């Protein structure tokens, strides 16, 4: 699933191609995504130019004078910039053709993605209204995590993956951040100290920054706006390394299921 670094990579990649470019046509080949693609999408987009490409959590927001286009990539979706005369491939469900002769194309094999239209303020939309802070926002601190976790018995890994606490920390990056902070993923969130939460908040920012700089993580099917894979998988310290030696102590990395997700950690370095 594309997580925050992958979505941010795509945001940065498509921005120069779509900002201030008038939409000249919209083609919806498959409207049945996670939610139906609006039947009036063409009327909302054609003739208008996008004024920006923003990201909120794992949602892309493309505002124009009439409203805002919301795109979510779901489990396996990708956005690419292609010449407008490029024939569609399998699972190319939505095309947004631009006056430049380029097209923003959504490919989504599993159809868990979304293309929606927002007429009001995006921050008031049901999908966005209850999200926590961005991990790079000033309000995301160890003190905030400590305060929100008091009395919580759930695993700290599940706690930091809760989008109401902080957005964009998916399974891969949660495992990596907890390892760097030296915190066992199964430790109860309410039993993590203020000092260790400060280390975790910094580790989250460091891991996400490194992943964005590497263009995201390719495990199955993530590619950027030009179809290139992300390379952060080459820098993973624990995720996907079950049985391999810890890079710090040499003990084999373990994998356990936490909250129905595979979680990787070192039993010596993480407490």
Curated annotation (Swiss-Prot):
Belongs to the FPG family. One of its GO terms (molecular function) is zinc ion binding. InterPro entries: DNA_glyclase/AP_lyase_DNA-bd, DNA_glyclase_Znf_dom_DNA_BS, Formamido-pyr_DNA_Glyclase, FPG_cat, MutM-like_N-ter, Ribosomal_uS13-like_H2TH, Znf_DNA_glyclase/AP_lyase, Znf_FPG/IleRS. Pfam families: Fapy_DNA_glyco, H2TH, zf-FPG_IleRS. Monomer. The active site is at residues 2-3, 58, 261. It comes from Syntrophotalea carbinolica (strain DSM 2380 / NBRC 103641 / GraBd1) (Pelobacter carbinolicus). Keywords: DNA damage, DNA repair, DNA-binding, Glycosidase, Hydrolase, Lyase, Metal-binding, Multifunctional enzyme, Zinc, Zinc-finger. This is Formamidopyrimidine-DNA glycosylase. Its EC number is 3.2.2.23, 4.2.99.18. Binds 1 zinc ion per subunit. GO terms for biological process: base-excision repair. Involved in base excision repair of DNA damaged by oxidation or by mutagenic agents. Acts as a DNA glycosylase that recognizes and removes damaged bases. Has a preference for oxidized purines, such as 7,8-dihydro-8-oxoguanine (8-oxoG). Has AP (apurinic/apyrimidinic) lyase activity and introduces nicks in the DNA strand. Cleaves the DNA backbone by beta-delta elimination to generate a single-strand break at the site of the removed base with both 3'- and 5'-phosphates. Disulfide bonds: none annotated. The keyword DNA damage applies. A zinc finger (FPG-type) spans 237-271. Its cofactor is Zn(2+). DNA binds at residues 91, 110, 152. SMART domains: Fapy_DNA_glyco, H2TH. It catalyses: Hydrolysis of DNA containing ring-opened 7-methylguanine residues, releasing 2,6-diamino-4-hydroxy-5-(N-methyl)formamidopyrimidine; 2'-deoxyribonucleotide-(2'-deoxyribose 5'-phosphate)-2'-deoxyribonucleotide-DNA = a 3'-end 2'-deoxyribonucleotide-(2,3-dehydro-2,3-deoxyribose 5'-phosphate)-DNA + a 5'-end 5'-phospho-2'-deoxyribonucleoside-DNA + H(+).
